[in-house]
Amino acid sequence: MSNSLGKLFQITSFGESHGDCVGVVIDGVPAGLAINVDEIQIEVDKRKSGAKAHTTPRREDDRIEIFSGIFNNFTTGAPICLVIWNKNIDSSEYERTRSKIRPGHADFTGFMKYGGFNDYRGGGRFSGRITAGHVMAGAIARKLISTIGIEVIGYTAELGGITAKLPKHKDIRQNISQSDVNCPDLAASKQMVALIQQAAEEGDSLGGVVECIGLNLPVGLGEPVFDTLEGELAKAIFAIPAVKGVEFGAGFGASRLRGSKNNDPFNIQSDQIRTTSNNCGGILGGISDGMPLHVRVAVKPTPSISLSQPTVNLDTMTNTSLEIRGRHDTCIVPRAVSVVEAMTCIVLADLALRAGIIPRVIKQ
């Protein structure tokens, strides 16, 4: 398994969905960064179940424990170890259907790759539960990149085919705080909630699109040719379970434009070189260009549904069917927002350190 990400700001994820805990070790955080457990907890609370409409009935406190690397509310420069204990575990449904591989899940591929020794309960290492560790690391990264003025904002841009109309950047956070699905378009938000409720009643699930923007990025983040800004972001974001696509700026839409329409013309704005449009999504040649970073992330429908689905029994090697009765989200898109934000912050922190923009000791 590959469980680490990053070069200088490096995270190592550990834990399983129904194991004792989930957590993360973060290496390379500069000393002197002011951070306390409450700041990390705020980010973790955004992704936990029960915070948004029709999330899994599995309720976890998700209280963070700091094992190392933070002393007197400052980072010490040592590895930071953060842990959340799993307390509300019910593996009975997974034991009942253990031999039946769940369509849309990693049960089959995990079984084949690890010879059946992998922890299958709740999806084990393949579960969205492990993203609690990603979000904890993202909270540290968010605080670190804030020292150079970078802000990262994610939101639900589309859910079940309902598309949000986006307000100005300054209004997004305020609107999201009033939405049950992290959508800045409050009219679309109500429609999304109703659609989630309908899908839940029908025993089905929904997917959608998360958008993430990064503001105030300096020019120069990204290490061509193999560690480009979009390459590192795509790798990190694809580590989120259920993500099936990532695009930047105009993305695949650029393939349908002429160069005269896709190119972003340069001009001088407040003594800075900027572009009058942003089809490149803030990245040119794999390097940040000073414009807002714009990422779109496709999230597939939750594969755990209560409708009967054809599958295979691994023990008997026969065709069978499966109805999933466990505790699952009808739509994970609203909860995925905080994870996409976290992975974006982690990559930006790593690349800012590699570029020498963030020092090894933070002086207040």
Swiss-Prot record:
Its cofactor is FMNH2. Its EC number is 4.2.3.5. Disulfide bonds: none annotated. Pfam families: Chorismate_synt (PF01264). Pathway: Metabolic intermediate biosynthesis; chorismate biosynthesis; chorismate from D-erythrose 4-phosphate and phosphoenolpyruvate: step 7/7. It is an enzyme of class 4 (lyase). Keywords: Amino-acid biosynthesis, Aromatic amino acid biosynthesis, FAD, Flavoprotein, FMN, Lyase, NADP. InterPro entries: Chorismate_synth, Chorismate_synth_AroC_sf, Chorismate_synthase_CS. It catalyses: 5-O-(1-carboxyvinyl)-3-phosphoshikimate = chorismate + phosphate. NADP(+) binds at residue 47. Reduced FMN (FMNH(2)). GO terms for cellular component: cytosol. CDD domains: Chorismate_synthase. GO terms for molecular function: chorismate synthase activity; FMN binding. PROSITE patterns: CHORISMATE_SYNTHASE_1, CHORISMATE_SYNTHASE_2. FMN binds at residues 125-127, 285, 300-304, 327. This reaction introduces a second double bond into the aromatic ring system. Homotetramer. This is Chorismate synthase. It comes from Dehalococcoides mccartyi (strain CBDB1). The lineage of its organism: Bacteria, Bacillati, Chloroflexota, Dehalococcoidia, Dehalococcoidales.
